[in-house]
Swiss-Prot record:
Name this protein carries in UniProt: Glycine dehydrogenase (decarboxylating)
GO molecular function, one term: glycine binding
Entry GO CC: cytosol; glycine cleavage complex
Record has GTP-binding as a keyword: no
Cofactor (UniProt): pyridoxal 5'-phosphate
Name of the coding gene: gcvP
Quaternary structure and partners: The glycine cleavage system is composed of four proteins: P, T, L and H.
Amino acid sequence: MLKNAQKDFIQRHIGPSVDEQNVMLKELGYQNLDDLIKDTVPEKILLKDDLDIGDPNSEYKALRKLKDISKKNKIYSSFIGMGYYGTYTPYVILRNILENPGWYTSYTPYQPEVAQGRLEMLLNFQQMIIDFTGMDIANASLLDEGTAAAEAMGLSYRISKSESKKVFVSKNCHPQTIDVIKTRAEPLGLEIIVGDEDKDIKEDIICGIIQYPGTLGDIKDPSEAISKIHKFNGKAVLACDLLALAKLKTPAELGADIAVGSSQRFGIPMGYGGPHAAFFATKDEYKRSMPGRIVGVSVDRHGKKAYRLALQTREQHIRRDKATSNICTAQALLAIVSAAYAVYHGPQGIKKIAESVSQLTKNFADKLKQSGYELYSNEFFDTVTIKTLDKTEKIYKNALDQGVNIRKVNSEMLAVSFDERKNLYRANQLLKIFNCSETIKETMNESLSNIPKNLLRTSTYLDHPVFNSYHSETEMLRYLKKLEDSDIALNKSMIALGSCTMKLNAVAEMIPVTWKEFSQPHPFSPVEQMDGYRELFTDLKNWLRSITGFSGVSLQPNAGAQGEFAGLMVIRKFHEKNGETNRNVCLIPSSAHGTNPASAQMVGMKVVVVKCDQYGNVDYEDLKNKAEEHSENLAALMVTYPSTHGVFEEKITDICELIHNHGGQVYMDGANLNALVGIAKPGNFGPDVCHINLHKTFCIPHGGGGPGMGPIACKKHLEIFLPKHSVIKDCGPVTGMGAVSAAPWGSSSILSISWMYIKMMGSEGLRKASQVAILNANYIAHKLKDSFPILYKGKSGNVAHECIIDIRTIKSETGITEEDIAKRLIDFGYHAPTMSWPVAGTMMIEPTESESLSEIDKFCSTLIKIKQEIDKIQSGEYDKTDNPLKNAPHTHVELTSNKWDHKYEREEAAYPSEFLRTNKYWPPVGRVDNVYGDKNLFCTCPSMEEYEDTAA
């Protein structure tokens, strides 16, 4: 009985009960799940043994175990800085966004009608960044500051007219930023010059990257260096501190072309490295070369203001190897939190925090000088670097003994950084550590600071009404609730997005993320203080080894696209070590996710596309011909398994063997790993390296477009090339590639989510989850096959964990498109499946294992009902242009207006199924005009008058 209690979570996570599974299996003609799997997955790759994960644990037991692990982390007061700072997450934001499934379980807002809430908050984020940087346009977040700086280099390289391949990076940049830039520059053949911006900019460059303020805290006027960068035909990039910009002149005023940085200190815990939302802002003229997603303002079909993702043709899912970046998952949830922080505090609140930090830092520095210390710079915002000379080691050790972490710059200098969480007590404690006799009695007059007068900010910021309206908790609470209710997330209904694995993000998995033991540590804390995190990392690595069959694991990549880049770089390093630098051709099937070709291009590989056959498999003959044609230069094959067409390819082992015979390596995109866990191990059937989407298979929520985690796993011969880190030396092998993420272990705090999931499921539950994911997908394919053709099936007639329904014949016969069906689904309260990918004119459905039989039946009956409406169009009962599909979605404003000119009844529009009468989602806007939005690009918050127009 007690042992069975430990399995309770398996039944909680998996939607269909055992009885419901049997009903579904019977309808498909199978006796049990094992028979279904044997008939669906190629026999030669089927796992013969159980995973080495252990028994399942109850929620309570797993939480107790993880709590014990977390307590092994020593929480010291951190003065380390380097881009990571203590901050307070206002509780109204913590509870109503960060801990709220209405926000964290939503998907990237590609369907704008069901995403107006998060789109509005992301637009607030963009407006906030534009205000602080003074730039014309900002994106809706990147992965971290190091990545953002590397993307700035990439933008500069794309638009450069110079023949130069040199990039200047100030030695005063954060070391982790320099590390990531070097990693990204190397495969592109770019030369990084690290030096002094006052002396070392002497020749043509692509761009110059300067930290503002510098990593040691010094504030220097970068105007002259920016002029020099422009003189030598480069773009000027300032890596900024967002809170400092409340006090400092904006990058735009100083002449910068691009501003990047992190919004972490706006309410996002350090989390031992993440997740945090980076920002990227630039001039209007470079908007079409920007990386990442951009939220813009458009109109719906009624002419009302509506938000949408703008300029999507820049992105990897459309432009593939010509994309501006391989970025897919970003940090939407964290951008939303930081924007909410600015909304809640407003300009006066932010100014107060900035001035408090600045004053405390100045007072501390003054007392140091009075005690005889010499400072590295007397002009600073929040960071003071002290020349401690032969006292360095003694002071550093004294700090550790007092439970305080400070930064050891070198053998003769220490640095301390203040933040929102620091107070007089902490400052005076630090003064004692430095053996100063005097203490700070009270803060100085707020007009006093150590910022140069010529760099003091005079321009305003956060002037928009949204930043000046919600400063009481009541008002903020209602604003956040209004936005949440505008959207569809998993707490409303199933989100059957193919290739996205929108499974349950259980509350028990989420709880540890905000524990102080996981949320408060600085990523560069001494490793001996972080035994809890190290144990969590070790467990997770061992489990991922068991699940994948690979030998080496790196947890550093903080998104799937980063994992792709890291995995391909590992392959590149392998060929380099073997003296085969000529190997630069990457074969990629035409069905691949857009990040694949974009990532291959980023590591300097030439993309050669391989055809797919009529059954959705890689065309083996075409692959064979291209492998032979490029044999001498073949670097890799990128393959997704099961395929993006939703089938288990029978020839996967032959495909891998073919590539190996031609000297190449096989990279497996792990986007569909949810169909393999406990069933087959990639390391056993041919691939050499793969990335793992923890935000898909292992339950990290999508957060409306991030965070994610994309660790990579590889075979023994590739382990020595896994990423290392310049700050934390024992992260990764000494022979490894440079850092791909700013933090050593990526977004460490959310790894606890995957730890909890795996611990609670155990070997048995993980296998069952994959089996039921495949069962649910095949049940849906079976239920829908008479209404919509299933485009691809495997050898036995089954699909994998997702299926593609073909809309192309419907479109040619009735004019109804996959978009019309997607928008009509909104009237039924459903987010659309994946549209027109990987095949145009189709929809890809992935139910995951977490959806119950009743929800799946409801979803299927909804699609069948929509097919009946299409039949009415074909028969002439419905008009071809004025029908419930072409006009979907229908808003409550439209349905309750005095005017109704449509050739169908209001009731047909509003309540097409009976279940909607008791649980109806009302979209806040009608169908959004995408063309208008891109032709009339507007990426800042609309005026209040325009908000009022929308509400009218």
